[in-house]
Design a protein with these regions (language model features):
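Cleavable N-terminal export/targeting peptides
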Residues: 1-37, 570-586
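Transmembrane beta-strand segments of Gram-negative outer membrane beta-barrel proteins
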Residues: 30-59, 77-86, 109-118, 147-149, ...
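Long, low-hydrophobicity, solvent-exposed regions enriched in small/turn-prone and acidic residues
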Residues: 33-96, 229-230, 367, 417-419, ...
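Exposed, low-structure sequence patches enriched in small/polar residues
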Residues: 64-72, 100, 181-183, 192, ...
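Outer-membrane beta-barrel translocator/receptor signature
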Residues: 65-71, 79-84, 98-103, 112-113, ...
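Outer membrane beta-barrel
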Residues: 89-156, 288, 294-295, 301-305
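The substrate-binding groove and active-site-proximal loops of carbohydrate-active enzymes
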Residues: 122-126, 214, 271
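Hydrophobic, small-residue-rich alpha-helical packing segments that form membrane-like cores
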Residues: 153, 158, 162-219, 231
Length: 586
């Protein structure tokens, strides 16, 4: 990390944690502490779930291991207002298919407005800084009223193996350490936040990969400002502005301070080198409500050089403009939403391809009464790409205009039938997608595709007898260039509850017929049987089996059988230790 003292933030976090303790205790009425200890006691709740899956195949090579085990557990302690949830997930190694074993352990004790995270946890700051990733370390969240603060420090997820065919923990070859902070003030009408994120790879352990390229240790730092403001009763605004600096190689030659502006040095916290790339990201949006009508609009721009290691995936070099309107009619029984937008990439004109995307959609939903529901959607997605050939910059640019047009539409109709004692329903679904390429205003016939799916299902049952059954039919039509394919599949299912709903049995089966280019190809039959049994009040036992058979193909090598099995066991427990009364459960 380019912070002068990498332990600065963890030390500050520790001080904050120690400071929070006396503040929390001071909120207690010390005169009544003894009586609270005697009356409340220690409450413990938790659960454990065990799962074992089996697999066997005939006629084809196995597509997964024959045996796999998973354990999930949770435990929560409550004492004098403190709450400490603990979670654990374990899976054994899938050796034949190179899937690693893994174990996740974490605990997040909470007291009033303070939460401490330890172990494998995740915290979200903002889209541009840290979102959607987990860490192994420590974190702290403080929410005393309108003030909000969050801190974390730990090892971030990294998935790289020197031998890509090896199974095991893929994080062992090198580590990425990260830290971050989020401080803000807000309520329902307005909020303002300052976000900080920093990450650095260990440079002492960094192996070559099979690809033959030495991956370089990187480092990254991001600062962002977020705001949300409500203006009057109808208008609200929100936005975020972020700046990122990213050294692609920690070992690159340093640069003089006078060659780097103050912003790229991140107020002196970051030390750029010759591999530096930097950029900005910002967005602004508004919402305006006019009774039954609502208006929305947003603008977002992310530079090519913007990077954050606090997200699993981040799309840069893009600009988005979107607008939408929604309206209700006929006493809120009809809802209409229209949305459209434009996306542009290659903002700095540094690539040979310039792409523009146009998106428009219309959504309708209509519920005239309790028995009918209708909905529909139409979307148009257009992707325009200009391919340019720059062989001689002294002559005009040669170019080819390529457009991809994708259209989709779906319709849903639901009709409630029967009575309260014997409910039933009929549902119809239709989905159609069409795509095609246009090159210099000419349609490419070989690149056109159409996908259509239609399904009709009927469900009925009797709550008093615990019986429910369903049947249906699904049709699929596919046109992909010169390939024509269609299939239809009737299905049936039955669920039955017994022994005062303690035992639930289910049966599902279907037969699919496939035909391609006018010739019958094959059929697929599937059968699923399962059951769940509630043992006493806290134990659950589940067993299921599924068989898949593909047959009817002239090529015998394409016919096969597969069997899947799964055994589940679950246990919930809870009770009180001490206190005025005991309420233990087994």
């Amino acid at each position: 990390m380019s912070i002068q003292n990498p332990y600065c933030l963890p030390i500050c976090m520790l001080i904050a944690m120690l400071s929070a303790g006396p503040l929390c205790l001071s909120g207690q009425n010390l005169d009544n502490l003894g009586s609270s200890l005697r009356s409340e006691g220690l409450n413990i709740t938790g659960n454990i779930n065990l799962s074992n899956q089996t697999y066997w195949a005939s006629g084809i090579a196995p597509r997964r291991d024959g045996m796999m085990t998973m354990v999930r557990a949770g435990l929560n302690f409550r004492f004098l207002g403190f709450s400490a949830p603990f979670s654990m997930v374990f899976s054994d190694q899938n050796a034949n298919f190179n899937l690693p074993s893994y174990t996740f352990l974490g605990i997040s004790p909470r007291y009033k407005w303070a939460t401490l995270h330890a172990g494998d946890r995740n915290m979200n700051f903002s889209k541009y800084t840290m979102s959607g990733i987990s860490f192994r370390g420590a974190g702290l969240e403080l929410n005393p009223g309108k003030l909000q603060a969050a801190f974390f420090y730990g090892r971030l997820n990294r998935a790289l193996a020197n031998d890509l065919s090896a199974a095991g923990n893929l994080n062992d070859f090198y580590q990425r350490r990260g830290m971050g902070a989020r401080i803000g003030y807000g309520d329902q009408n307005s909020a303002y936040y300052l976000n900080f994120f920093s990450a650095r790879d260990r440079s002492d352990v960094f192996p070559d990969t099979e690809l033959g390229e030495r991956l370089r240790p990187t480092e990254n730092m991001v600062l962002s400002v977020q705001a949300r403001q409500r203006i009057g009763k109808r208008l609200s605004l929100h936005g975020e502005l972020a700046h990122s600096v990213y050294n692609q190689d920690q070992n690159a030659q340093p640069v003089a301070d006078e060659d780097i502006n103050f912003i790229n040095r991140m107020l002196g916290l970051f030390r750029p080198n010759q591999s530096l790339i930097s950029g900005q990201a910002y967005n602004i949006g508004l919402q305006y409500n006019l009774g039954q009508t609502g208006l929305q609009g947003s603008y977002e721009r992310i530079d090519r050089g913007y990077r954050t290691l606090g997200a699993l995936f981040f799309n840069n070099d893009t600009e988005n403009i979107t607008a939408g309107i929604n309206r209700t009619f006929f006493k809120n029984t009809l809802q209409v939403f229209v949305n459209g937008g434009l996306e542009r990439v290659n903002l700095d004109d540094s690539e040979r391809e310039a792409t523009d995307r146009v998106i428009a959609s219309v959504n309708l939903s209509y519920r005239p009464n309790d028995r009918w529901f209708l909905s529909g959607m139409y979307g148009n997605f257009r992707n325009d790409t200009k391919l340019r050939v720059r062989t001689d910059f002294t002559v005009p640019v040669d170019s080819i205009f390529l457009a991809q047009v994708n259209q989709s539409a779906n319709i849903t109709a639901l009709r409630q039938l029967g009575t309260t004692e014997r409910p039933a329903s009929l549902q119809f679904l239709l989905n159609h997608q069409r795509a095609g390429n246009v090159v210099n205003d000419s349609v490419v016939n070989s690149a056109q595709s159409r996908f259509t799916t239609a399904s009709l299902s009927f469900t009925a049952g009797s709550p008093t007898t615990g019986l429910q059954w369903n049947t249906g039919l699904t049709l699929n039509f596919i046109e992909l260039g010169a390939i024509r394919s269609r299939s239809f599949a009737p299905i049936v299912g039955i669920n039955k509850s017994l022994l005062n709903n303690a035992l639930t049995l289910n049966f599902n089966s279907g037969l699919s017929f496939f035909r391609q280019s006018g010739t019958e190809d094959n059929k697929v039959f599937n059968l699923h049987l399962g059951g769940n049994y509630q043992l006493r009040n806290s134990h659950r036992l589940g067993l299921s089996a599924m068989h898949i058979r593909r047959f009817g193909s002239p090529d015998a090598l394409r016919n096969f059988h597969e069997w899947y099995g799964q055994l589940n066991y679950g246990y919930n427990f809870g009770g009180k230790i001490g206190g005025g009364s005991s309420n233990n459960q087994n």
